[in-house]
C-alpha cells in the first residue's frame, strides 16, 4: 500500500546533508511537513526554506547535547503535537587512523553516530505514540555489517546502531511502531566528498558511489512496505554478508578488493574535480566552498 504523506510530520536529522535534504524535499513534495534537525544552521535554513508546501521547521542544534535534544522535541510538540516519521540520518566519519586520533574525537563520533539517535528516539517516543502510524527510520550503512579498517570507530557506531535498531524494532512492533533501517553503500554526498579527499576507505570506491535518489527510494519503499532492513544495492549487501561468514578470512580477502578500490577512488576524485566540487592545490585536493 502506498504511504500517504499528507499532513504527516517528518523529523529528519542531518537534514542539511545529501541524503537528509533529498528525503526532506521528497516528503514535502508529497504533502508531508518537514522538521529538519542539523548543526549547520545556514545550510539547514536553506534546505527548509527551499521546500515546497508550508508549515516546515528548521531546528539547528548539537545532537550530542541531551538537553538540546529535549528542547528540540518540546518545540516539535508545541507546533505539531506528534511525530509520524522519525528519521535518524545524521552521521560523521573521520579518516584519522585509530592509533593517531584523540580520545575526544572518538567520543564525539560515537556520540553523534550511535548515542544521539538512540537518545533522540527515546525522547521522541511520546510524540511518536500520538501518531496513527508511527515510524522510526534510520540510515545505517554497509559499514554496519562489514568492518572498515581505515574507519573503525565509524564501523563501531554502525554495527552498534544496526543491532540497536533491530532490537528496538522487535520490541516496538508489538506496540504498533514500525522500525526500518536503510543500509546504503557509498553514496555521493558531501560527507563522502570530504572522506575522498582525506584518504578514507578505498573499498567504498570499488563501484561508483550511488546517488542520494537511490537511497531515498529505499526509504520510500520501506514506508510503503515496512521491513526491518532494506539495502539500496542488494547485490553489494550479499557480497559483504558472505564475506563475513568467516571473519578470519578477511585479511586474505582485503588485498583483492583494495586494488579495485584504489582505482575507483582516483576515478571519483577526477569526477569531483570535473564537477567543480574539489580542486587540486599544490598536489592536495580541497573542497570548493
PLM regions with names:
Residues 97-98, 102-110:
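Substrate-binding pocket helix/loop in short-chain dehydrogenase/reductase
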Residues 2-33:
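Canonical Rossmann dinucleotide-binding motif of NAD(H)/NADP(H)-dependent dehydrogenases/reductases
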Residues 121, 157:
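Active-site helix of classical SDR
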Residues 141:
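Residue(s) in the substrate-gating loop at a strand-loop-helix junction
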Residues 30-46:
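Conserved glycine-rich Rossmann-like NAD(P)H-binding loop of the short-chain dehydrogenase/reductase
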Residues 170, 174-236:
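SDR active-site lid
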Residues 89-94:
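Conserved NAD(P)H cofactor-binding loop of Rossmann-fold oxidoreductase domains
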